[in-house]
Amino acid sequence: MDYKSAGVDVEAGRHFVERIRTSVEATHRPEVLGGLGGFGGLCRLPAGLEKPLLVAGTDGVGTKLELAQECGRHHGVGIDLVAMCANDVITCGAEPLFFLDYIATGKLSPAAMAEVVEGIASGCSQSGCSLLGGETAEMPGFYPAGRYDLAGFCVAVVDEPRLIDGQTIQAGDQLLAIASSGVHSNGFSLVRRILEANQVPLETSQAALGGRSAAEALLEPTLLYAPLVKALLQSPELELRGMAHITGGGLPENLPRPLPQGLAAQIDPGSWQRPALFHWLQELGSVPERDLWHTFNLGIGYVLVLPESSCQQALEVVHNSGFTGWICGEIVVGQGVLGLPAGA
């Protein structure tokens, strides 16, 4: 008996590494030393930082992977993996520096895994960070054949004098919402139950979704907000006081995270139109309003906190960067998130 007959194909693993090499090395910033194949990735700190702070974050894609694997759509979840990590670490004003991935699978499918890594590389390129390394673990008997799980790790850097920690936020500051691309990567355990209970065909056009299929709408990759945040930070006379990445828990659980004690986020639910995808899910699944607000982003993927004097310039940067943004509320004295509709 050999290793291959036990379910681990080392040669397929080598071919996989060669297949992804070009995509991975294309993401490398000037600070990266060496290429693939070392025991560890090497990366210098960017020059010109007075007191550099490293910011680290880790995350996964959750059960969105189940839907992606069922549909054979693997590229987008690679982007999702980077977005879930990078969108978190940039909330303190940090610039993503490098990314590491971990892929665990029952049996290595070089084609599917290459799609995933190409998606990860695309996400890294969009975020301006290097895909510095990764691990692909073939674990027969632990994971079913054809199934895989993903974990990502992002390290960013910020100069301590430019750290955004929310401590300068004050009553009267405005909340600038940045649109999401859809469900992003949270709430898919509920999504999958809704699809299963209603026997929704995944690849069939849905009128309620503007002609897109459920697979197309639900597997739309998470938006990467790093290019926008970088553009905002480079804008003269624009002051960013806080940021929130709207993930699991929705607006009610993520908006308070950057706020100092004694301040609340007063939102205006009438300031935006909830995307059709969320109406469709709510109707199909008879989802209570509270669960909707505490599970999904409802069309807002990222929120900026800034003084009113910076709003117009910030909105111009948002739109010039290809994103959609609007004022969705303000900071008031209080606690948590205020202004939620009845039942939320």
Curated annotation (Swiss-Prot):
UniProt entry tagged with the keyword Cytoplasm: yes
Pathway info: Purine metabolism; IMP biosynthesis via de novo pathway; 5-amino-1-(5-phospho-D-ribosyl)imidazole from N(2)-formyl-N(1)-(5-phospho-D-ribosyl)glycinamide: step 2/2
CDD domains assigned to the protein according to its UniProt record, in alphabetical order: PurM (cd02196)
E.C. designation(s): 6.3.3.1
Transmembrane segments: none
GO cellular component, one term: cytosol
Broad class of enzyme this protein falls into: ligase
Gene3D superfamilies named in the record: PurM-like C-terminal domain, PurM-like, N-terminal domain
InterPro entries linked to this entry: PurM-like_C_dom, PurM-like_C_sf, PurM-like_N, PurM-like_N_sf, PurM_cligase
Places the protein is found: Cytoplasm
Gene Ontology molecular function terms on file: ATP binding; phosphoribosylamine-glycine ligase activity; phosphoribosylformylglycinamidine cyclo-ligase activity
Record field: catalytic activity: 2-formamido-N(1)-(5-O-phospho-beta-D-ribosyl)acetamidine + ATP = 5-amino-1-(5-phospho-beta-D-ribosyl)imidazole + ADP + phosphate + H(+)
Keywords: ATP-binding, Cytoplasm, Ligase, Nucleotide-binding, Purine biosynthesis
ATP-binding recorded as keyword: yes
BP GO terms, sorted: 'de novo' IMP biosynthetic process; adenine biosynthetic process
Family, per entry: Belongs to the AIR synthase family.
HAMAP family named among the record's database cross-references: AIRS (MF_00741)
NCBIfam families noted in UniProt: purM (TIGR00878)
Name listed for the protein in its UniProt record: Phosphoribosylformylglycinamidine cyclo-ligase
